[in-house]
């Protein structure tokens, strides 16, 4: 059965926007944005797309304004929205690693532990999570909402510490701050409205989206290798091969040669290709992968 009314897909606007649109493209969904328009085109008649603030997507999905969308685990915890968490999708603005919400203080401050901040002012956008973090630790602090430029609050004397999100810590250090604790590890999550999830047709579509997004993410860290190998060198070449599964080995028309194909981790290729060449492989081709399911 097909979906009669297109499902509404929430795409995070802002720091995750470009990475999410690229991921959707690799998964098979091309997004075409229009200037000053929050309703981009998508090449799927069963979907309509909406650009929304990542902080608002959980609420929109809970309320049925959106059927499915991508948001941060941090904002899901912050809002406490009642939604179905379909899967974790570990990617962020610049990498395929989780991001961290960290507690940071001035580099020259005397504070070295969260306990040292008792009675102090903490600035953050992640208000609820930060309050729970200190409450769980039994530390009384004054948590204040930050409307932006959070890293500057300590420098300007507006706060004694901040809780801010970071991928690498570079921006934190650039503002003369020092991380003293990790508050939360976060990543992107695919979430769905509960009514949409209970509908068989819509659930099938959500599961399709999840499958292809996961496949595209998995492919990011993998590459394919093809090569021709003389029969006399086949065992030596196969001994060099790590693989996602067993390599594909096929005889060629010239029965003194084999074609070998594998999928390997991108990080091993620079060392692997020279070893394969030394073992007797020829015509080695490396190619990118769009999805690995």
Swiss-Prot record:
Keyword tags: Amino-acid biosynthesis, ATP-binding, Cytoplasm, Glycosyltransferase, Histidine biosynthesis, Magnesium, Metal-binding, Nucleotide-binding, Transferase
One GO cellular component term noted in the UniProt record for this chain: cytoplasm
Q: Which Pfam families match?
A: HisG, HisG_C
Q: Does the keyword Translocase apply?
A: no
State the compartments where it is located. Answer: Cytoplasm
Cofactors that this protein relies on: Mg(2+)
Any one GO molecular-function label of the UniProt entry: ATP binding
Summarizing the function annotation, the protein's role is:
Catalyzes the condensation of ATP and 5-phosphoribose 1-diphosphate to form N'-(5'-phosphoribosyl)-ATP (PR-ATP). Has a crucial role in the pathway because the rate of histidine biosynthesis seems to be controlled primarily by regulation of HisG enzymatic activity.
State the family it belongs to. Belongs to the ATP phosphoribosyltransferase family. Long subfamily.
Write the protein's name: ATP phosphoribosyltransferase
What would be the name of the gene that encodes this protein? hisG
